[in-house]
Amino acid sequence: MSIEFKNVDYIYAPGTPFQTQGLTNISFKIRSGSFVAIAGHTGSGKSTLMQHFDGLLLPSKGSVTIADKSITSNTSSKSLKEIRKKVGLVFQFPESQLFEETVLKDVMFGPLNFGFSEQKAKEQAIQWIRKVGLSEQVMNKSPFELSGGQMRRVAIAGVMAYEPDILCLDEPAAGLDPEGQKQMFDIFKNYQREGHTVILISHNMDDISQYADDMLVLEHGHLIKHASPKEVFSDPDWLKKHFLDEPATSKFARKLEKGGFQFSEMPLTVDSLVNEITTKLKSKGGNE
């Protein structure tokens, strides 16, 4: 399911002394079934942008089109329910979207809200509680008794349980150990492979280079680049200018290049780095 922004502005507290420009003239299109990363330093407008995907925020100017439904400044709350069934948001702080008495009830809430039967909602909830790596022992606990990492998993399960066409994630791996982070990102990547669109906000360029196939870069509420991660990360000077880190893999590869190692193309993932080095060494060995 595709998303298109056309000349979107967003203004916080318009007409008051606290008026602030959140987004300025944002235009882009996200392909259906893609894995898109949104990057930018703190305060660049990433979370503001994401909240436009399901109408939590309405554009002050311009339009957002999702599944042939247009969202503008005049869109009513009633007309947003169909869009919100198709777009799931996982916020940066999971406690902000947990509220039920038990984990099971919390994860069931989304499916029930969007028309699932009680039995189907329970089946979906149990399935996704397991998928995100939680044991059934937590199902009858209050979500607020859990650790931060467990709460994040519950929040993710609660959105994925109604299987939205578009999944939006704001720093979803924060608070998880490396194994937990990989487990979550493998779930998100598999969800994309099943035909869904996944949108990720992250400060972690390694995650972006590993999983995303498209990338939006924001700065002070402006979209300054829309390209593949390969293109964005190909220019370390541009990254430095805009206060973005380079993925650890390509940073290491550039050090190897300074030592005389030549890459056919700059690797962005550990697998591509290892494959490139292995191929070069085998080729060199065969020529000796």
Swiss-Prot record:
Gene3D superfamilies named among the record's database cross-references: P-loop containing nucleotide triphosphate hydrolases
Q: How does it sit in the membrane?
A: Peripheral membrane protein
Q: What is its EC number?
A: 7.-.-.-
| Residues that coordinate or bind ATP | G40, H41, T42, G43, S44, G45, K46, S47
Q: Where does the UniProt entry say this protein principally localizes? A: membrane
**Entries under InterPro entries matching the protein:** AAA+_ATPase (IPR003593), ABC_transporter-like_ATP-bd (IPR003439), ABC_transporter-like_CS (IPR017871), ABC_transpr_CbiO/EcfA_su (IPR015856), ECF_ABC_transporter_ATP-bd (IPR050095), EcfA2 (IPR030946), P-loop_NTPase (IPR027417)
Per UniProt, the keywords (alphabetical) are:
ATP-binding, Cell membrane, Membrane, Nucleotide-binding, Translocase, Transport
Q: Which GO terms describe its molecular function?
A: ATP binding; ATP hydrolysis activity; ATPase-coupled transmembrane transporter activity
* SUPFAM superfamilies, A to Z: P-loop containing nucleoside triphosphate hydrolases
- Is the keyword Translocase assigned to this protein? yes
Q: Name one GO cellular component term.
A: ATP-binding cassette (ABC) transporter complex
Stretches assigned to the ABC transporter domain: 3-245
Q: What class of enzyme is it?
A: translocase
Q: Where in the cell is it found?
A: Cell membrane
How does the record describe its quaternary structure? Answer: Forms a stable energy-coupling factor (ECF) transporter complex composed of 2 membrane-embedded substrate-binding proteins (S component), 2 ATP-binding proteins (A component) and 2 transmembrane proteins (T component).
Q: Which NCBIfam families match?
A: ECF_ATPase_2 (TIGR04521)
Q: What does this protein do?
A: ATP-binding (A) component of a common energy-coupling factor (ECF) ABC-transporter complex. Unlike classic ABC transporters this ECF transporter provides the energy necessary to transport a number of different substrates.
| Stated family | Belongs to the ABC transporter superfamily. Energy-coupling factor EcfA family.
Entries under PANTHER family matching the protein = ENERGY-COUPLING FACTOR TRANSPORTER ATP-BINDING PROTEIN ECFA2, HEAVY METAL TRANSPORTER
Output this protein's name.
Answer: Energy-coupling factor transporter ATP-binding protein EcfA2
| Organism of origin | Lactobacillus gasseri (strain ATCC 33323 / DSM 20243 / BCRC 14619 / CIP 102991 / JCM 1131 / KCTC 3163 / NCIMB 11718 / NCTC 13722 / AM63)
The gene coding this protein: ecfA2
